[in-house]
Amino acid sequence: MVSATRSLLCAALPVLATSRQATGAPVANELRCQCLQTVAGIHFKNIQSLKVMPPGPHCTQTEVIATLKNGREACLDPEAPMVQKIVQKMLKGVPK
């Protein structure tokens, strides 16, 4: 019985290893930086919300993603002085 189970597992292993779910394809897309290009700044009045994502296993850089009032998203350069001012303004606007 044990050898039959072992044979079945050995036969199924190549099929499982080559399937899309077994390779983790969707996870690989999530484990990368979202911002490939950044802009130095966008006018504060055009920003609806702001996401600041610290470095982590998915990306070694801090990422600042602005959702604009027209629904589009823009990656901002976290090192740019204008972006740092925008982040500070957004933080001050958050009720405590």
Swiss-Prot record:
Monomer and homodimer. GO terms for biological process: cellular response to interleukin-17; immune response; inflammatory response; neutrophil chemotaxis; positive regulation of cytosolic calcium ion concentration; positive regulation of hematopoietic stem cell proliferation; positive regulation of neutrophil mediated killing of fungus; positive regulation of potassium ion transport. It comes from the Eukaryota. Belongs to the intercrine alpha (chemokine CxC) family. This is Growth-regulated alpha protein. Gene3D superfamilies: 2.40.50.40. The gene is Cxcl1. Induction: By lipopolysaccharides (LPS) and inflammation. GO terms for molecular function: chemokine activity; growth factor activity. InterPro entries: Chemokine_b/g/d, Chemokine_CXC, Chemokine_CXC_CS, Chemokine_IL8-like_dom, CXC_Chemokine_domain, Interleukin_8-like_sf. Residues 1-24 form the signal peptide. CDD domains: Chemokine_CXC. Disulfide bonds join 33-59, 35-75.
